């Protein structure tokens, strides 16, 4: 087995390792140790299971009591009560119990859904993350946020439930569609924008190599982003403070996702447009020079990501943002930049927010 690079999310007795490397699904003693003697439910989607489902089953079956593969339809629409219920039905049919293990094999949708299935099954069982998309590898697989969507808002139903292990096999990215790759780059850009301008500048330099799936560039970005995410989660697991900074671009972005209908805009695409809007708000609040907004917009554009939002009535955006998870008594709270590499949270005057939205519609 190739030696993975190991990062640790330091949460005391609930700490866990993140493995990053190539070929980690071919041979993996740590992953097998987690599954040893247990009933394992490998939850994946209709795109990923045909490619990697049998591989993960073959890796775990020799040590597990049983391996059950559960497949949900690909796409954001699967983050719903019906799919969660179907997963629990299949687990109960297979007689999984409180000692069983769930493995989330796929992108961010599968990770969120399978993680919530683990958090809610028999009051909580162990799970491991095997992210196969760039977005999941650099962001959503780390930190323990799990959940499903509601018609009124994204990720409105869920729980914090930390994985026991994250296995990020960079080899899985070679099968990732170019649109999904670009969506993952939105989260890479976000990490640099909120926490490390030098990293953001390196991402800009590496962008052609990242879009070409060049292994060294991808590994560099994944490790750097995971270090930022792991440090933030260790400092603020439950999002009482600094972890909210990871939602830069998400207040505007979630409004785009909900308004368009889940899955019409990929999460990373919506966050990309949302970051431009949040950065413009930062400029108008006097927190960041306009030149840095232009720099961020150029980097986002270079990743083949949108920088403008759908041309809906501004009132529609405000209605969706009022039930954002960061909202305080229905008043939106925004993550803004005190210059590239430095994030903060703030409220903003509604008239100013309206102007920002209106100026960034297609």
Segments the model singles out, each with a brief description of its role:
Residues 1-101:
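ATP/NTP phosphate-donor binding region
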Residues 21, 42, 80, 131, ...:
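Residue-level signal for inorganic ion chemistry
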Residues 10, 34-35, 94-97, 120-122, ...:
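Solvent-exposed alpha-helices and their adjacent loops that cap or buttress functional pockets
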Residues 109-116, 137-138, 254-255:
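Short glycine/serine/threonine-rich phosphate/pyrophosphate-binding segments
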Residues 113-124, 259-260, 280:
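Alpha-helix C-terminal capping segments
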Residues 202, 206-315:
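Active-site segments that bind and position negatively charged phosphate/pyrophosphate groups
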């Amino acid at each position: 087995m190739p030696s993975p690079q190991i990062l640790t999310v330091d949460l005391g007795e609930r700490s866990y390792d993140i493995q990053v490397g190539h070929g980690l699904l071919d041979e993996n003693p740590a992953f097998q140790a987690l599954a040893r003697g247990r009933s394992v439910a490998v939850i994946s989607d209709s795109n990923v299971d045909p490619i990697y489902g049998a591989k993960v089953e073959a890796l775990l079956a020799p040590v597990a009591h049983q391996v059950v593969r559960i497949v949900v339809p690909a796409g954001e629409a699967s983050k719903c009560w019906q799919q969660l219920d179907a997963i629990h039905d299949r687990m109960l049919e297979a007689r999984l119990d409180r000692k069983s293990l769930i493995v989330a094999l796929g992108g961010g949708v599968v990770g969120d859904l399978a993680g919530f299935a683990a958090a809610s099954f028999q009051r909580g069982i162990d799970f491991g993350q095997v992210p196969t998309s760039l977005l999941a590898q650099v962001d959503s697989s780390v930190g323990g946020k799990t959940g499903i969507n509601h018609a009124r808002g994204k990720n409105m139903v869920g729980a914090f439930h930390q994985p026991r292990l994250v296995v990020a096999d960079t080899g899985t990215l070679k099968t990732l569609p170019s649109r999904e790759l670009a969506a993952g780059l939105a989260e890479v850009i976000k990490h640099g924008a909120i926490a490390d301008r030098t990293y953001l500048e390196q991402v800009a330099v590496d962008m052609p190599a990242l879009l070409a799936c060049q292994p060294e560039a991808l590994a560099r970005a994944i490790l750097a982003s995971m270090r930022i995410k792991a440090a933030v989660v260790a400092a603020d697991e439950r999002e009482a403070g600094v972890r909210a900074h990871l939602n830069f671009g998400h207040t505007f972005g979630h409004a785009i996702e909900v308004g368009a209908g889940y899955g019409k805009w990929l999460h990373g695409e919506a966050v990309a447009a949302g970051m431009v809007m949040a950065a413009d708000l930062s400029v108008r609040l006097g927190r960041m020079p306009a030149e840095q907004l232009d720099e961020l917009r150029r980097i986002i554009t270079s990743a083949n990501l949108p920088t403008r939002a759908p041309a809906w009535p501004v009132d529609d955006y405000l209605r969706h943002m009022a039930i954002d998870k960061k909202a305080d008594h229905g008043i939106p709270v925004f993550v803004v930049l005190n210059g590239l590499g430095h994030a903060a949270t703030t409220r903003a005057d509604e008239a100013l927010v309206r102007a920002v939205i209106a100026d960034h519609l297609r």
